[in-house]
């Protein structure tokens, strides 16, 4: 241990010319000995604005202890987070996906400016995970991601409840299915404390994907936020990073095409969020791996859906943790030949080596099925194409009895207009809702539609109405819904010229998304289509519109 591990920070601390730099560092606690140790950046997404992140400062301190114990000198710094749950359903959601880019940019800026020899990033809410990983890819110093952990379920009248319970209660209350008293009780009990939303929603999906990628320690993905195990996970991550520096292992050696195939497989088996498609493509682009919708389609067709997890199933992430966690699932998949066991990880060992001594899934548990008893023989994330989405779209079919619908289009130019129509009973069984100008540029920010989809479920329309959009869906969404339609309406995609009453089809069994009008009619309408003006003229969203790429490219803003 010593100066030979300071491959980056030596330019900040070494030599007579760096005396002013060292003077500044002494003021924040550095000693003479510290200048001979590797400098470690700890990127914390702590914030008081969301339960997903409210505990992360304590976790960052545990990481700091581990780094110190292993011979490094740690520096905690902050980056932003927003709360998808709190922003949902209003103008604030425009800022959600752009926050991913700001997280990535800010971590890249700080750790490259300080010349950190290694970086540990700690994330909680949805956009933290991909934002942190994108930054670690750009920096490409030895790095580890630590997940803040999943929330414990709430309890209302003896039943487990969570964030989706209260979103769906809005529709139920409006439809007269529950009393105001029950409505209020659900609100008061849905979120009991710290941690990320508890089903296989976006945060838990991405934590699982990151463990499968090899960028977090085995077992990290499914641990509850409030637990001694999570605190120890953080401590061990701090120690493990010094091992990575000693071995010279960086994200570029870990994040290979096969690693991304592992992540996709785990997401599909668990019934993960559609957002994983967007985020994994974005992370892959940052590290220089070619990953496309076709890869998701190829893997989905041969990967069964095995885990009975919310939103389409019964169980929460804490339930999965009790029967073996994500690493238990991965061990089963490796035995079944469904994972690449030779992929390197942040332990310095391969996936197969990590899993060798990990426990199997608990016998006779009912959360994760065997391949022979799969919930569905193929993956629940389905890539659709057709004359409505020439470049592709993404659907999720887990928990659905119907996976196709043909019906008249009900067209809305924004999520807000659609939500009002649902709440005033203007949507009927058999309708196919079109919400457009909600894409990366058109929204801007590709808003999530949990308020809309939950209102449909609460109204009893979840199985009888289709919904398609160039926006996104929350990991908590379930129903016959299609998002990420590309090209988006703002760019003149065919979704821009659909008219009320056009017959449209969502057919997940055929990977088809189409409007039943002739190509000549589509071309005619597109010729008369006029682009809309950007909704924001100044500020971060105006800048975002100028930089953001399509959903099929991960909605990245990096100039790759």
UniProtKB/Swiss-Prot annotation:
- The answer, when asked if Translocase is one of the entry's keywords, is no
Which PROSITE patterns has this protein been placed in? ILVD_EDD_1, ILVD_EDD_2
Q: Which InterPro entries match?
A: DHAD_IlvD/Edd, Dihydro-acid_dehy_C, DihydroxyA_deHydtase, DiOHA_6PGluconate_deHydtase_CS, ILV_EDD_C, ILV_EDD_N, IlvD/EDD_N
Q: Which biological process, per GO, is one annotated for this protein?
A: isoleucine biosynthetic process
What is the free-text note on the cofactor? Binds 1 [2Fe-2S] cluster per subunit. This cluster acts as a Lewis acid cofactor.
* The protein's annotated pathway: Amino-acid biosynthesis; L-isoleucine biosynthesis; L-isoleucine from 2-oxobutanoate: step 3/4; Amino-acid biosynthesis; L-valine biosynthesis; L-valine from pyruvate: step 3/4
EC assignment:
4.2.1.9
Protein name from the UniProt record: Dihydroxy-acid dehydratase
Protein's gene: ilvD
